[in-house]
Amino acid sequence: MSAVEQHIPNDQFLQKLTAFYRDSKIRGPKSVYVTMKPYDGRTKAMPKGSTFKEGDEISCIFRAKWGSKKIATEVKAKEVNKFHTQYSAIIVAQMVNLEKRKKTDDEKKKTGATKA
């Protein structure tokens, strides 16, 4: 992406996120990273100690990264419930992709020692 991040529409974000999860199961990196944070439209950092003003409409920005591919969307306060419902459905559907982490020999020794 360029220096100024381009946000895609929410529906398109969810479609691409689903594709990221599907592709991570088939090929490429196994991990898909999703982050979210409050967003007020600024492109530069806020000074220390400053907070959102009462008049500001606070929205939420969702970012997803899979390998070198990145996507982002801005969810307005009015659309949060609808978006969260759709996002939750995607996450629940992708839980089948979870794999049990393989423990190293050191971790096996530590857990065995604590059980005794």
From Swiss-Prot:
Identification of the protein by name: Signal recognition particle 14 kDa protein
GO cellular component: signal recognition particle, endoplasmic reticulum targeting
Domain of life: Eukaryota
Function (record text): Component of the signal recognition particle (SRP) complex, a ribonucleoprotein complex that mediates the cotranslational targeting of secretory and membrane proteins to the endoplasmic reticulum (ER). F37F2.2/srpa-19 together with F25G6.8/srpa-14 and the Alu portion of the SRP RNA, constitutes the elongation arrest domain of SRP. The complex of F37F2.2/srpa-19 and F25G6.8/srpa-14 is required for SRP RNA binding.
Entry's family note: Belongs to the SRP14 family.
Keyword list, A-Z: Cytoplasm, Ribonucleoprotein, RNA-binding, Signal recognition particle
Organism of derivation: Caenorhabditis elegans
Keyword Ribonucleoprotein part of the UniProt annotation: yes
A Pfam family this chain is assigned to: SRP14
One GO MF term: endoplasmic reticulum signal peptide binding
Subcellular location: Cytoplasm
Record InterPro entries: Signal_recog_particle_SRP14 (IPR003210), Signal_recog_particle_SRP9/14 (IPR009018)
UniProt key word RNA-binding: yes
Subunit structure: Heterodimer with ZK512.4/SRP9; binds RNA as heterodimer. Component of a signal recognition particle (SRP) complex that consists of a 7SL RNA molecule of 300 nucleotides and six protein subunits: srpa-72, srpa-68, SRP54, F37F2.2/SRP19, F25G6.8/SRP14 and ZK512.4/SRP9.
One GO-annotated biological process of the protein: protein targeting to ER
